Amino acid sequence: MAGSSYGNIFRVTTWGESHGKGLGVVVDGVPAGLELCEEDIQIFLNRRKPGQSKFTTPRKEDDAVEILSGVFEGKTTGTPVSMVVWNKNQKSKDYSEIASYYRPGHADFCFDEKYGFRDYRGGGRSSGRETIGRVAAGAIAVKMLSGLGIKFLTYTRSIGPVTINEVNFDAHEIYNNSLYMPDADAVLKASEYLEECLKSLNSSGGVCECVITGLPVGLGDPVFEKIDANLAKAIMSIGAVKGFEIGDGFDAAKATGLTNNDAFIMRAAAVSKETNHSGGTLGGMTDGSPLIFRAAIKPTPSIAATQHTVNKSGEDIEISIKGRHDPIIVPRAVVVVEAMAAITIADALLMNMGARMDRITDFYKKL
């Protein structure tokens, strides 16, 4: 199976299955000398691990990370950083029944058709647990970028019909609730909505939003390495994501050139923008403004409500999916979205180091 690697210089390869022995990641291109320990990674993994609220899967996993290589005496060595998280709470028998049919909204049918064989236990590589490796790699990227003043603020913007009110926006509220919403009123309304979903044996989707600040001008390369194009690829590669937009996104299609253009102004002796409809990118490069994007996440496809499908013999059947599943995955996806964004920015930053001859010359003059 191809397609398990992402990035050019800061390159991430994930491996493992939901019900295998473990899941992990190899991160190549990490600069030497970055202070790094398992706790730096664990903080991020704790944000996505299951069983933290009634709105997430009851599967209990510590998701404790082990760094296997690439770190010595608390610092990265410049060699590949390899990490693993061992699975400890698999209940594969919960999935034995689904080996004979195709779950609506899942990759079962496509895996069977493409490979002629699939790991039906929790979805194998198409499981949400695959994102463990992404989050571990993203933690390294965030640590690296934070030292350069680049910060990430990622949160749940909406759940089902409930959207945060910008007037009530409070960044401190994000980590005070299990839904990762920056609006206390929206948390209450979203919780009530999710309770109704649970009662009806159903699930919900939502939207994650990410704001990246401290970016220099010029990250990203025309034409096929545009920063917004690479972010779209990174975010859309997350299994549950069905939509991506940056800045005003699809609303830009309703605007006029005059209302959509961001006027340039001088501010503190530097070129700046009066507005940020573009979401922090121009011509596929960062423009120094906050980079703002959103990811639309579909409802969890594994639901206990009765659904119609077919089995491998081609017979029409009715199913009710058993097992331990999230009624909503948006809150746990927040850190995954942040991780993929950080990986993309880290890769673009390293690629940008060779963009100008004077920077290369200055570097070698210091040697």
Give residue spans per PLM region.
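Short acidic, glycine/tyrosine-flanked loop/strand segments centered on an H-E-D-like triad
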Residues: A99-G124, Q307-P327
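Glycine-rich, N-terminal phosphate-binding loop and its surrounding beta-alpha-beta segment
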Residues: F44-P104, D108
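Glycine-rich, mobile lid/loop segments that gate access to catalytic sites or pores
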Residues: E113-V223
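N-terminal, positively charged regions that mediate nucleic acid binding
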Residues: M1-R59
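Internal helix-turn-beta structural module
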Residues: R11, S302-L367
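A short glycine/serine-rich beta->alpha loop
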Residues: R11-T14, D119-E130, V217-D221, N276-T281, ...
